[in-house]
């Protein structure tokens, strides 16, 4: 008889079950449940993800192939498609959402490094659109004959771990997702050109956080003062004020504008930031990383 643990059981043995049980109790996940517990549901979904299952039917078939080993694999009793579907539909999703963020925090602590030598964390924020079949996901209508959702992700650059997710309709403009980012005091947030929303950028500044964003080419501004001695590849390092009517209303204070020449890509980048104590090269490296 095989006495060692299966690989899947070894993988999930690192999961903090005590904290998961705390969340289950907090949200009443196992209330009136006799067989298919939240823990069984979690392991079933993890198995489906790791084995690239494409549907609930595919997942339950894959699990029931190993029915005699289900105890050692920690799935519990016989897993059916209907039980799994009901659990996914009826149980409080906050159990799994909170536990996912708990695992992310654990992973970040174990991978903590100090690449930038800064006091705060460094994040980048961007979105990706996932196409969906309208016949199946009718609620995700994006265009006339196309469905989709957007996943907005906050990514910790130093640990290389995503720390926050926000899912919206594909129609939602990227800048709207800036409103739900859990900003941290003293941390740095790096954005691409599509996030040039000065009202939202000013909010970051008022929260005592820092941002670095690529500037649009049609930016209207005037220089207040600038540095004369510039390091290699820094074309300009200036303090500016926005002169456009609405941009100035939304961001009434001065900004820092850094122009950088990237030798690898053979092109120029222009950044806006409220981080005035960092060097110009540090600003460029925050975006480049």
Q: Model-derived features: where do they sit?
A:
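Major-groove recognition helix of helix-turn-helix-like DNA-binding domains
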Residues: 72-93
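Short helix C-cap/helix-to-loop transition motifs enriched in small/turn-promoting residues
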Residues: 69, 93-97, 106
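A glycine- and small-aliphatic-rich helix-loop capping segment at beta-alpha/alpha-beta transitions
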Residues: 140
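Noncatalytic carbohydrate-binding groove/subsite architecture in carbohydrate-active enzymes
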Residues: 114
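DNA-recognition alpha helix
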Residues: 55-73
